[in-house]
Amino acid sequence: MTTRIGVALGDPAGIGPEVVWKALIRRQPDPRITWSIYGPAQFAQSVALSLDPDSEWFDGWKFRLSNGAEGELISVRPDLSITSDLIGRSSALTGTVLYESARLAIKDALEGKIAAVAAAPHTELSVNQAGIEFSGYPSLLSKTAGLSSEVILLLIGGHLKVAH
């Protein structure tokens, strides 16, 4: 049995998509894990192929990276076109996609479709430009799950622990 882990691509205009794919490409794949990548599918696939041209794509948005990691893209807002000219620029369009990608991943986790959610870097400015009140992933998680709005993000790395 495999465990499915969801990853929201973050802001398509930023480093999120590249961070996600490089992390998956460079890690030793675990055959017990499959990945669900949430974001604009065509754009996400183009980033993946630019970093891993030997990856295989089949049955729509399913993939097998050259290192053997497997998963699928979960297409978010296919009505919105993310193009390379948007990279590096905060916009309402990229903010909408960022927000909807993370929200869908959280909903899928709450419904048991995936076991966990990770999210790539985001840009609050982009989401706010879309007219969506957003102060980061922790508040989005609590709002989507119907929890208290008082949340704390805990970052742990090496000997460093930060609560924000």
Locate the predicted segments by residue:
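Contiguous, glycine/small-aliphatic-enriched amphipathic segments in soluble metabolic enzymes
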Residues: 1-138
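Ligand-binding beta-strand-loop-alpha-helix segment within the catalytic cores
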Residues: 66, 154-164
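N-terminal beta-strand/alpha-helix entry module and adjacent surface
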Residues: 132, 142-145
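Ligand-binding "clamshell"
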Residues: 137, 148-152
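A generic local secondary-structure boundary/capping motif
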Residues: 142, 151-155
